[in-house]
Amino acid sequence: HLNQNYSILTQLQAFALDAHFLIEQSGRNQQGAFINFNGTAGIWRKSCILDAGNWEEDTLTEDLDLSYRAQRKGWKFVYRPEIKSPAELPPILSAIKSQQFRWTKGGAECAVKHAGKILKENHPLSIKFHSFAHLFNSTIFIAILLTSFCSIGLWWGVQLKVIPLELFWASGISMIGFVLVAGVYLVSYLTAQPYSWKSILGAVWKLPLFFSVSMGLALHNSQAVLEGLTGKKSPFIRTPKFNLESGSVSLQANAYRLRALPMSTLLEGGMGLLFGGMVLLGIVYDNFLFLPFHGLLALGYSLVFISSLRTR
């Protein structure tokens, strides 16, 4: 990551991408499961591309689409995590949003295109399972959005004593998944750099902030996923590149910056206020059941909203 230390946003992106490349991609490849070709550092055989049907333009993630078509025909990818390729991370939130929108919507489009075919084809059960989880992984943002709204109703239900407190504690089983996901990111982060107290302290603040910002992108990314699943088409929006290594490039002058303020940005500001209000209610009424969750949501949506206003 050429500009990993440029800002908190770039550090959080590096934190997430290291987990993807070091654990997710490596794990799938070692198990013989389908993985996605990475355009930053990947080499195709021309014969593979042609045999798989060449590039197609019916999804926003044409690399993921071609990867699945090739692997479904029996081609194998060789993943080499020790080989590094320099790449720039989006330094502003509008660029991150456009990239996230393309990735999540394109992933959903590929899920619609390939998931059913993979289930019908003669692949091992493990490959079908991993492929289904991989193709539909962007739906996690819809789950986050629904869970955040449901948490408000559950909080009021417990507060008004119309929902048994035991129901809340039963929902705590979801923490198992949270711990597992957190473990993946911690392992990848500590593996990607020299082990030291500095790296450990870095993980302490990056992990919760990463989860918070990811939650803050749930509204934006859920829209992308729903559009992908329902077949709504949209143009390919290029991720801006700023050449920050030169030290003389203005972020404001980039031609690919988003100038207009989307309605979703205003809704994100409203979500920040909503969950900030839930945090205050929890403190006022001594009902701290969802305080950490609502706190992360309030912080995440507020950061996304403010950063969107500053960098459009």
Where are the predicted features?
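Generic structural signal for helix capping and beta-alpha/helix-loop junctions
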Residues: N3, A87-E88
